[in-house]
Structures are given as C-alpha cells and as structure tokens.
C-alpha cells in the first residue's frame, strides 16, 4: 500500500480477546504500543473484550489496573467497531452510527490464545486485505494445535517430545497403565491448543492422572499426554519469511516444578531467564538450525518462538512452536532479539515491514 498524505502507515494494534490469555495480551499490548515509532507510523488501538466485541481505545486510558497482572483489564468501551472490507484495505466504522475511522494499513495482533493465534483472526485479516505481523492461516492453525505440530515435524524429521493424544470423544477413560508403560513417569498433561501453560498438570503417579486429564479437557477437546523430560528448557526466536533469522538461545530456569502460568505472568521474578544460554557452540548451532527447519516446515512467516528440551543425555527435542509469542516485560521473544542486537523498537518495526512483505508475496500467488 502507498503511504498516506502524512507519509505514515497506520498500524492497528489488536489486543485482549476471548481466550484464557486475555490478560497476558493486555500486558503485551503496552510494550508493543510503547515501542512503535510515531515518526513512522500512526496508531489505532483495538481492544477485543471477553465477548469478542471490537472496541476503539484511547492510548491514555484504555487499561485499568495496568500495573497489576492479576487485575489488569480493559476500560469500559467508548464505542464498538465494525469492519467493512474494501479493495485497498478495510474501513473501520462506529458500529452504532456508521461513522468512519481511518483505514488500517498493517495489523499488529497480540491476541494470544484461541481465536487470536489459531488462524481465526489471521483469516479475517487476510479476507480484509490487511497485512499482519505473524504467520499465515495455515501456519498459525497448525502451530496452535500441539498434536498437529508434532505430526508435521515428525514427517519433516525434527525430533519432538514423545506423547500420546487423547480425544474427549472416546478417550475420556484411557488405559492409564498402558500410557504410563509407554511414556513412563512423570507425565505432563496439557490441552492441545492452549498457551501460557494454561490447563497443564504434572503427573507423578497413577492417582493424579484422572484429575489432570479432567482439567485439560476443560480447555480443549484434544489433550496431549507428554513424557516428562529431564533436562534444560531452551528457547529461540525466529524472524523472517523465506529466509528466516534465528536469535541467540535462551534458557528458562523455573523454581516451580514446571514453568506454569503463575510463574510466567503472576510471579515473574521466580522464573530466571538466562540469555544467552550457556551452551557449547555446536549445541547452540544445532538448536538454531533445528528452529529454522521447524519454522519453514510448519509454514511460519514473520515471527515465532521455538521451544526445546535439551535432555541430560544431550538429545535435542522440540517442545512447541509459538507463532504469537508474548511481548510482556518478562517475555523471552523480545529479550532474545535484544541480546542478538535488535532492540524492542527496531524489532517491532522489523515485524511491521515483514508483515507487509508477506502480504505482498501472498497477493502475487492468488
């Protein structure tokens, strides 16, 4: 798209959403908004409330309890938005009276979790001809479903954490002894399509299996039972489209039994992030190369965070791929790029540029 008369592109930051990660998304939005270069971009803030309604927000007062991770929330809506698709982008209008607002050139979504990073919003934005920061519909959908992620990666020859997939229809009473016999103990039981460790339980004996499974099924109709891995948690950040770059490696040192939601977002000081991770150069290179291979195999573009286990025996296992990583003050993705020489404002600018490039590529193959 051509720049506007002001010479600036208009970036819409989308945040909130209906998922269990609503509050995490609000926290991410603060950092992204702060980092956007106002000399280059005009800004539209779109908050999505827990009912799925799009609201036009004012940067000065769009959040309540912004300094409290447990109580942060959207301020009451001033007006609800509707979106009208057009040939050269989408037009925002006031849903009540049809009053138009400036059109959007690029969307920067931090709508974490269901509907926000599973391909739903990505599909909407693509239909609306709005470039957006993050993978396309397919890459987003596949990476959101941890079972499908593993299937694609196994086919691509990328080693993944051993697991068993259970469905709520038919597998609500699985053969626990057989699963323990196959995977051993401890086990991690998790919803297939949740993030931020929501609904995840560590199971150390047979007695805890049923409750952990019931919790996971509260959040998804598909559940993964994963082998507990003894080793280190290593993460990498990937950036780019056809020729992605990979950051330095970082390590998570969690004081809890695993890196749970509370540790990540409510008790951030209890989880240590070591960047760069203390790794032999050949291991770090292998991790970064595997991250790149997984990113391309899964059809990712613009950005993703790729998480690994490095076992006590030195084996690398890919744990999961997050196509819309956190941008909070404690989030690993921006910290990894900062350690790689790309500060927060430069990272956000790069993501916006990549979003536009990805949209141009998609338009050429229609």
Curated annotation (Swiss-Prot):
GO cellular component terms given for this protein: cytosol
Q: What cofactor is needed?
A: Mg(2+); Mn(2+)
> What's the main place this protein lives?
cytoplasm
Q: Which NCBIfam families match?
A: D_ala_D_alaTIGR (TIGR01205), PRK01372.1 (NF002378), PRK01966.1-1 (NF002525), PRK01966.1-4 (NF002528)
The protein's Enzyme Commission number: 6.3.2.4
**How is this protein named in the record?**
D-alanine--D-alanine ligase
State the gene name recorded for this protein.
Answer: ddl
**Taxonomically, which superkingdom?**
Bacteria
